[in-house]
A protein has these predicted regions:
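Secondary-structure capping and domain/repeat boundary segments
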Residues: 1-70
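Short, surface-exposed linear motifs at loops/turns and structural transition points
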Residues: 67-215
């Protein structure tokens, strides 16, 4: 009698389109190269890199994560809700499928780095990123942060409870999007560094002038 081996096959999809049938327990290799999604592929809360091997235990539908751009708005604004302070605003631009992944707020998150201008210029190489060793405020938008004013992809980071002696101190910011992969590595996409450092006094004066113009 010949043993009969039954193999269970599961369908693998990318963006809803079948790309392969894989035996349960075996691996599927994600696309790589020029035709692959730039930042990899997402499934069930996990981001995978191009060319990564993924063990198939059930049907899988990966979402392509393509171009992501984050742009910092010029200048700064006054934060008036809750604790008062200085607010910087950024916006994320991405295709629809990538934006669905960003909206899940698990493997891809966003934030704002804020620091004093004199600390930034004192580095010598004028660098502001997540690895900066000088005093920097990292404001993560987070799951509960939502989008600013209900506009998808727009978020803010604020510095609050600023001491009076710092009202004339210039502050600046840089926005970022962070992708956390299954292999515990990260890729960070940054905006340009703000080219218009602002003091609390400057922003407050502009806010008052703008408010008065509405009467």
């Amino acid at each position: 009698i010949t043993d009969i081996k039954v193999e269970i096959v599961k369908e693998v999809k990318i963006d809803g389109t079948r790309v392969d049938n894989v035996v349960v327990g075996e691996t599927y290799t994600l696309p790589s190269g020029d035709k692959a999604a730039i930042y990899g592929y997402y499934c069930d809360g996990v981001m995978y890199k191009q060319g990564e091997e993924v063990t198939v235990n059930d049907e899988i539908d990966f979402t392509s994560v393509k171009d992501i751009t984050v742009t910092l708005a010029n200048g700064a604004g006054i934060r008036t809700q809750d604790s008062a302070g200085m607010r910087f605003q950024a916006s994320i631009t991405a295709d629809d499928t990538t934006m669905t992944v960003i909206n899940k707020q698990d493997a891809i998150t966003e934030g704002m780095l804020i620091t004093a201008y004199n600390l930034y210029t004192g580095t010598g190489d004028h660098t502001l990123d997540l690895k900066s060793t000088y005093t920097t405020l990292n404001v993560e938008n987070g799951v509960k942060g939502g989008w600013y004013a209900g506009k998808e992809g727009t978020y803010c980071g604020s510095i609050v409870n600023i001491q009076k002696e710092n009202y004339i101190r210039k502050f600046m910011a840089r926005a970022y999007v962070e992708i956390k992969y299954s292999d515990n590595t990260e890729e960070v996409i940054y905006s340009d560094v703000s080219n218009e450092p602002r003091t609390v006094r400057q922003v407050a004066k502009a806010y008052i002038a703008d408010s008065n113009s509405n009467y």
